[in-house]
Amino acid sequence: MSKWKDVKKVVLAYSGGLDTSIILKWLQTELGAEVVTFTADLGQGEELEPARKKAEMLGIKEIFIEDVREEFVRDFVFPMFRANAVYEGVYLLGTSIARPLISKHLIDIAKKTGADAIAHGATGKGNDQVRFELSAYALNPDIKIIAPWRDWSFKSRTQLLEFAEQHQIPVAKDKKGEAPFSVDANLLHSSSEGKVLEDPSQEAPEYVHMRTISPETAPDKATIIKIGFEKGDAVSINGERLSPATLLAKLNDYGRDNGIGRLDLVENRFVGMKSRGVYETPGGTILLAAHRAIESITLDRGAAHLKDELMPRYAELIYYGFWFSPEREMLQAAIDHSQHHVEGEVTLKLYKGNVMVIGRESAKSLYSDKLVTFEDDQGAYDQKDAAGFIKLNALRLRTLAARDRK
């Protein structure tokens, strides 16, 4: 293609799946470019060796497979959870938060290998194309970015399957013998889209769920756990200190076994359309409940309410792909400042899809049982003071009422 005639070497974000395997072959045949592959171990729960073997089978000489699980949770997931970030009230941003990390590594590998372009497998209809590319341009304004879904002649996944068969590219099959759903997975979540899921009126089949058992079949006995926090980040489970990735993986196990973290939603994509997806975020759902609980006793009311006001904007920036933007970094600085005293332990009960906070304690707690007790508070609070407080706050309301009744 004349558009990319000057491109000699491309770093491809490669999963080993249908789309990126076809993209790899397309880059070789249509552009005549040398392809370097990058596969990230984000905790998706798959063996990555098949991706290496498939890349080798397709003639790739430079193959990068990197374990980025700790970096992912430490530098991306945990900062996001300090903000309690949720998009449109329900989505915990599992796909969104992984894209800037992948772009960061693509840019690093392009520099290391002398590549003049990067490529990704995101479609021209979705959010991921925006997330990958905004992140890449923020890190290297001169990088060329190839998005084959916007350039090639394929119009459907059926055509992709035909191309794969023509070029003898293996395609995984699901339990029903068909090409799989469009799936994204990492240590934080998994998502499924496409096929019958495109009809939002129909319940998702049970076999779509990969990370959790059904709440109906979860154990009849509740699971009790304790999560410890320091400066807003989870650091331990049941008193055992764990690395960020290990901790999230363990929470995923607890969530999976108790049917926690399933979400069926229709969301508003950045590009303007609505899409339906089935998401599973077992560990993240538990972590969010625990973080909110420890904040409830350690954050001042003003700081807590300001955080709640900033959160939707912060979540939107991540969803739209602006992780490396100055405004996200400004918000992050404010959020991180609020977390200095967010430490302690939260006790949770996990039962049939539910996460229930049943206890919270902290050496930095602002909760005072002496102030709130219904019993004798030994002079800690003079209830007579409330009269003046109410009178001053009622001043403008009484003034308005006096005017309006005339």
From Swiss-Prot:
L-citrulline binds at Y91, S96, N127, R131, S182, S191, E267, Y279. GO terms for cellular component: cytoplasm. One of its GO terms (molecular function) is ATP binding. Pathway: Amino-acid biosynthesis; L-arginine biosynthesis; L-arginine from L-ornithine and carbamoyl phosphate: step 2/3. Keywords: Amino-acid biosynthesis, Arginine biosynthesis, ATP-binding, Cytoplasm, Ligase, Nucleotide-binding. One of its GO terms (biological process) is argininosuccinate metabolic process. L-aspartate binds at T123, N127, D128. It is an enzyme of class 6 (ligase). The keyword Hydrolase does not apply. Its main location: cytoplasm. It comes from the Bacteria. ATP binds at A13, Y14, S15, G16, G17, L18, D19, T20, S21, A40, G121. Transmembrane segments: none annotated. InterPro entries: Arginosuc_syn_C (IPR048268), Arginosuc_syn_N (IPR048267), Arginosuc_synth (IPR001518), Arginosuc_synth_CS (IPR018223), Arginosuc_synth_type_1_subfam (IPR023434), AS_cat/multimer_dom_body (IPR024074), Rossmann-like_a/b/a_fold (IPR014729). The keyword Nucleus does not apply. PROSITE patterns: ARGININOSUCCIN_SYN_1, ARGININOSUCCIN_SYN_2. It is found in: Cytoplasm. Its EC number is 6.3.4.5. Pfam families: Arginosuc_syn_C, Arginosuc_synth. It catalyses: L-citrulline + L-aspartate + ATP = 2-(N(omega)-L-arginino)succinate + AMP + diphosphate + H(+). Homotetramer. Belongs to the argininosuccinate synthase family. Type 1 subfamily. PANTHER family: ARGININOSUCCINATE SYNTHASE (PTHR11587:SF2). This is Argininosuccinate synthase. It comes from Brucella suis biovar 1 (strain 1330). The lineage of its organism: Bacteria, Pseudomonadati, Pseudomonadota, Alphaproteobacteria, Hyphomicrobiales.
